[in-house]
UniProtKB/Swiss-Prot annotation:
Name of the featured protein: V-type ATP synthase beta chain
Function: Produces ATP from ADP in the presence of a proton gradient across the membrane. The V-type beta chain is a regulatory subunit.
Keyword tags: ATP synthesis, Hydrogen ion transport, Ion transport, Transport
Pfam families: ATP-synt_ab, ATP-synt_ab_N, ATP-synt_VA_C
GO molecular function, one term: ATP binding
Native source species: Chlamydia trachomatis serovar A (strain ATCC VR-571B / DSM 19440 / HAR-13)
HAMAP family assigned: ATP_synth_B_arch (MF_00310)
The UniProt record lists the keyword Transport: yes
UniProt-listed GO biological process terms: proton motive force-driven plasma membrane ATP synthesis
InterPro entries named in the record: ATP-synt_VA_C, ATPase_F1/V1/A1_a/bsu_N, ATPase_F1/V1/A1_a/bsu_nucl-bd, P-loop_NTPase, V-ATPase_su_B/beta
PANTHER family named in the record: V-TYPE PROTON ATPASE SUBUNIT B
Stated family: Belongs to the ATPase alpha/beta chains family.
Length: 438
């Protein structure tokens, strides 16, 4: 038998406080209003008989005498094949104007996957983007963010990755999206041909902040079931985790929590980590690969959100000036696949290209300061132009093997074979044969 409580003592923003007993954290609550409407909330915290609830859809029209019913179960989302091709809001309701979605209700808050059942990542995820495939390989079950400067088109990069990987299912979690962003995701998924294997959970900028916090949990709960029960390789794309953190910040301020760095709650690190740790490669099962977007306010990489994220994830892609910056990017799992799942020259060639590109930046700096350039400086600057145009541009869309061949051609056009610092046996095998020492 469910107990009905009618003593709401405080309404503040999207949070209400009710006097009740026996509540548990994360428990789902139904609120029946005097006008006949009903809404849902979840338990955020409790102190003796005072229980704080976050109300989905806002508290507009709520009165202190409305009925509050604790349902004895956590927030749930529908799981099943019927999700594919559908779009949902932060409470799990369809927003694509189609029929109601039917499936198995599953809780959205579950522990991270059992470490005993995890396996060491060993499969490369190909994106056909040279700055990822060649220099910072994406590995199946990796958790990695895209650190995006202001004004960068990170959404287009996400959709390219979604379309060009071999993932069985793509789940997109959008937080704080404008209508333009939301429409872009819908149209691009259709244009690129993966809409039928895509599930979207969308929180728009005009929606309640409490719904924003639920988006990653819903996306990852469904991904975990697809990976575990159907052995699917699932790609989860979350954008924007800074909007997620801002929603946490707003809720913490409303609850009068003592703020930490720049007003964010002291639990920010844990709140991020518990989501990122859902990435997994399951023994005799599927996998979850997680790519997120973290925008950096004021291009500040020391901002609490990217700063905490960097300690949790396995590297990052640094998007700047419409390129993936090789010096700010890192994949901590690339050594598991480079040379093992890829061509033997991959590691040496990538290292040589990045080393020479770093030297070319120094030459460009000397040129800008008016210093006289040596012949070596001129070679480096010519190399830099070729490298940026043929490999760094995000317009380039080629498989890894072709990117490696282009890398050799760029070296051949810019240097003598003795100048690039690559092992002689690789030079003999891969250096263009027209002139071995040119």
């Amino acid at each position: 038998m469910q107990t009905i409580y009618t003593k709401i003592t405080d309404i503040k923003g999207n949070l209400i406080t009710v006097e009740a007993e026996g509540a548990s954290l994360g428990e789902l609550v139904q609120i029946e209003r005097a006008d006949g409407r009903s809404s849902y909330a979840s338990v955020l915290r409790f102190d003796a008989r005072k229980v704080t609830l976050q109300v989905f859809g806002g508290t507009s029209g709520l009165s202190t005498g409305d009925k509050v019913i604790f349902l004895g179960r956590p927030m749930e989302v529908i799981y099943g094949d019927s999700l594919l091709g559908r779009r949902f809001n932060g409470t799990g309701k369809p927003i694509d104007r189609e029929d109601e979605c039917f499936g198995e209700p599953i809780p959205i808050t579950t522990p991270s996957f059992n470490p005993v059942c995890r396996i060491v990542p060993r499969e490369m995820v190909r994106t056909n983007i040279p700055m990822i495939d060649m220099f910072n390989c994406l590995v199946k079950s990796q958790k990695i963010p895209i650190f995006s400067s202001s004004g960068e088109n990170h959404n287009a990069l996400l959709m390219r990755i979604a379309a060009q990987t071999d993932a069985d299912i793509v789940i997109i979690g959008g937080m704080g999206l404008t209508f333009v962003d939301y429409n872009f995701f819908v149209k691009e998924s259709q244009r690129l041909g993966f809409a039928d294997k895509c599930v979207m959970f969308i929180h728009k900028a005009v929606d309640a902040p409490v719904e924003c916090v639920l988006i990653p949990d819903m996306a990852l709960a469904c991904a975990e079931r697809f990976a575990l029960e159907q052995k699917k390789n699932v790609l989860v794309l979350l954008t924007d985790m800074t909007a997620f953190a801002d929603a946490l910040k707003e809720m913490a301020i409303t609850m009068d929590q003592i703020p930490a760095n720049r007003g964010y709650p002291g639990s920010l690190y844990s709140d991020l980590a518990v989501r990122y740790e859902k990435a997994v490669d399951i023994a005799q099962g599927g996998s979850i690969t997680l790519i997120s977007v973290t925008t950096m306010p004021g291009d500040d990489i020391t901002h609490p959100v990217p700063d905490n994220t960097g300690f949790i994830t396995e590297g990052q892609f640094y998007l700047k000036d419409n390129r993936i910056d090789p010096f700010g990017s890192l994949s901590r799992l690339k050594q598991l696949v480079i040379g093992k799942k890829t061509r033997e020259d991959h590691g040496d060639l990538a290292n040589a290209l990045i080393r020479l590109y770093a030297d070319s930046r120094k030459s460009a700096e000397r040129m800008s300061m008016g210093f006289k350039l040596s012949n070596w400086d001129k070679k480096l600057l010519a190399f830099s132009e070729l490298f940026e145009a043929r490999l760094m541009s995000l317009e380039v869309n080629i498989p890894l093997e072709e990117a490696l061949d282009i890398g050799w051609k760029i070296l051949y056009q810019s240097f003598h074979s003795e100048e690039v610092g690559i092992k002689e046996q690789l030079i003999q095998k891969y250096w263009p044969k027209a002139c071995l020492h040119k």
